[in-house]
Amino acid sequence: YRAKPTDRQQTAAGRLLDSPEVDLVLGHHAHVVQPVIRRDGDAVVYGLGNLLTNQPGDEANPCRSCPPQTQDGLIAWFQVTETANGAQITDAGYVPTWVDRTTTHEIVPIGVDDPEQVGPGVLAESAVRTAAMVEPALRRLTFTAG
């Protein structure tokens, strides 16, 4: 569970962004949120975290090798605008998510109808960990009822 991209990941992302055909690179499978970088209207999301997991972690079957960061994830959003010089990312945001590892393995979008059975401190800590990895490259999206 590496919170930072490897040299290989960084080299590959840089080479992809060097191409005029690539504006966005989305990485996955790190099982933890990894940094987001913006470069000249392009972006790299190195790791989206866990959006689906069957790793154990409930009281009956704890995952001793799974740090809390393996329950973090994000839904990324990008606005792409066509310009005279090609496409450019003109806005970007995210919604932090948290994996409930009890019987449902539900993905909880933090700040969107948070479930009562999950302590608010748990969700807040997850959101802080995610923000530390992706801000300021992405802004946190908020939702209002109604």
Residue ranges and their predicted role:
Residues 1-2:
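Short acidic, glycine-rich surface-loop motifs adjacent to enzyme active sites
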Residues 7-74:
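Conserved beta-sheet core of the metallophosphoesterase superfamily
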